[in-house]
Structures are given as C-alpha cells and as structure tokens.
A protein has these predicted regions:
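Short hydrophobic beta-strand element within catalytic cores of glycosyltransferases
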Residues: 230, 239-242
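Carbohydrate-associated surface elements
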Residues: 115, 134
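Conserved donor-binding/catalytic core segment of Leloir-type glycosyltransferases
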Residues: 144-180
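A charged, aromatic-enriched C-terminal amphipathic alpha-helix characteristic of glycosyltransferases
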Residues: 272-304
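Nucleotide-activated donor-binding/catalytic signature segment of Leloir-type glycosyltransferases, i.e.
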Residues: 187-205
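Aromatic "clamp/platform" in nucleotide-sugar-dependent glycosyltransferases that forms part
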Residues: 222
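Nucleotide-sugar donor phosphate/pyrophosphate-binding loop at the beta->alpha transition
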Residues: 71-73, 80-101, 111
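Short alpha-helical donor nucleotide-sugar binding micro-motif in glycosyltransferases
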Residues: 201-202, 209-214, 296
C-alpha cells in the first residue's frame, strides 16, 4: 500500500517496542509498551492516522487522536469475536461491544468486503466503508498453466481450528492436497492426515509458483472477513471452492471464478472444469493496490 501512497507515511507496529505473542494466536503480536507507542506517535506529529488494530497500539493511537483532535479511520480485518468464541468461549456480545466503542468514532470503518459491511451495519457499527485489496506482482507467477492428471488442490493460510481445514484434509484420498502455512494444529493434522502435503510457510515468487502448479484453491473457512489468499490464487488462474459465507461471496463469481456451496468436494470437482486462463486474465485487472490506497485517501483525507 505504501508504495502507491502519495503522502509521507509512517508505520507504527509492535516490532518497534517490546511485545509478546498472543498465547492462543501466536502470529498476533501484542505491544507491551503502549505508552511508548503514544510517545512515538506524538514525536511524528501526524495530521491523519489510520488505525489498523484494536490492540494496545491501536488504543494508544485512538487516545492520541481524541486528545489532539486528529482525524482518523480504523480498519476491521479479523473476526476476533468469532475466533475468541471458538477458542475461549468468550461471548460475542462482549467483544462486539468493545469493538463498537473502539471503531464508531472514526471517520470511517474500512472493511474488506460488502458482506462484512452489511454484517457490521446490522450490529450497529457506523460509517462502514468497503476497502478493497490488491495482489503484489511478485505473487503472480509467469509459469504456464498446466492441468494435472490427478487433481491438485491447495490451501494457503493459517493452520488453526477456526480455518476448518479438517473438512479439506478428509478429502486426501480423492485429491492431492497441499497446505501452505503454519499454526497451532499443524502437528495434529500431519499425524491425522499423512497423505496431505504440508509445506509450512512460503513467500513471494516461490509461493506464486506453488499456486500455479495446482488446479483449485480450496478455502474452507467460515469465519474470515475477506481472505486475501483467494485473490492471490485467482491471479494465478486457480478457481475457488468454498462455502457461501462472508469473504468468498464477495470474491467468487459463481460458475466463472469458482463455486460456493455446502458440499466442498462437489465445489472442487465443478471448479476443475473452469477456464483457468480466463480467470487469471480477468483477476489481474480487477484487484489493484493503487485503487486500495485511493480509497484510504478518500475517506481519511475527506473534509468532516
């Protein structure tokens, strides 16, 4: 995003301070020094702020904005209420109440999809706007598209309970399945599903080439706000097989770029008949980081 920004931009993130990993979600870094984060923001003296986290750094930024009358937008990217319910049985009303207080005073709550916007509007969130995403060029492979003799299915992302991956892994006798990523249930899945290929983390052009070697991208999660890996897959010509839920319904054009429904295996088999070259050419025109930053500027810099 920053590459396309026309403004002088600073990023405040947990790596600038002492931090710890969230015990049940290690990829989430929690800043242990929010006061230092506040001082860092004050030192920069920004004219506008976008807050992309509801954690300690986000709270520090929000307090700074309120005290200094700085216009700000917020981003809602993760369904933490659903995750915390699945992992810790924390009731939805507790986390959504906190999130409403956190977000509702911003100039705009930027969300990745129209269905996510509708969900938040129904829950009483104000000024919710859709903020699209893009695909970096190094994540689009220039390798030719080839159809496999035995269908190759791929998932890329966090390997955790809320991603519903066992539904995909149970198809290990019917397809060649590859899972790219790591997470707390990786060891368990490796033991339970020996025929599934688990590659761990992969990035950049290597990941792009892995996408290209497969036939269908399967996204079994029912709790994501968007799923940027889906547009990465589409940019490499992979149709999407998923459930008809928030995220996939905003990305997949039924019968053109994938299939959605309750039967994941059937969705995969139908995807195998789609034109991959057509998918790749259409998606590369649709998703743009330049458009993404334009949306941010529109809402953050607009007159109150």
């Amino acid at each position: 995003i920053l590459k396309y920004s026309r403004k002088k931009t600073y990023v405040i993130h947990p790596g600038l301070f002492k931090w710890k990993s969230f015990s049940i979600y290690p990829e989430v870094q929690i800043c242990k020094e929010p006061l230092k984060a506040y001082r860092k923001i004050k030192e920069i003296d920004p004219t506008h702020i976008h807050i992309g986290t509801e954690g300690p750094i986000g709270l520090a930024a929000r307090v700074y904005c309120k005290l200094n009358k700085i216009p700000y937008t917020t981003g809602y990217h993760t369904k933490f209420p659903e995750y915390l319910w699945k992992l810790l049985r924390i009731p939805h009303f507790i986390t959504y109440s906190y999130l409403k207080v956190f977000h509702n005073d911003s100039k705009a709550i930027l969300v990745p999809s129209h269905s996510c916007k509708e969900e938040l509007n129904k829950k009483g969130f104000n000024q919710v706007e859709v903020w699209t995403r893009g695909v970096s060029k190094n994540l689009i492979s220039d390798k030719p598209i080839r159809k496999s003799k035995f269908p190759k299915i791929i998932y890329v992302g966090r390997v955790s309970k809320e991603k519903n991956l066992e539904v995909l892994c149970e198809l290990q006798d019917k397809f060649e399945i590859t899972i790219v990523g790591e997470g707390p249930i990786l060891k368990k899945l490796k033991l339970k599903y020996p025929k599934v290929n688990f590659l761990g983390y992969r990035f950049g052009s290597e990941l792009a080439d892995i996408y290209k070697r497969h036939d269908v991208f399967c996204f079994p999660s029912k709790t994501d706000t968007f799923g940027i890996v889906m547009i990465e897959a589409l940019a490499n010509g992979l149709p999407i097989a998923a459930y008809k839920v928030t995220g996939p319904i905003d990305i997949v054009e039924e019968g053109v770029t994938g299939y959605l429904g309750d039967d994941l295996e059937n969705n995969i088999r139908r995807c195998l008949k789609l034109d991959r070259r057509s998918i790749a050419s259409n998606m590369n025109q649709k998703w743009s980081w330049a458009n993404c930053i334009e949306i941010l500027h529109t809402h953050l810099l607009k007159e109150s």
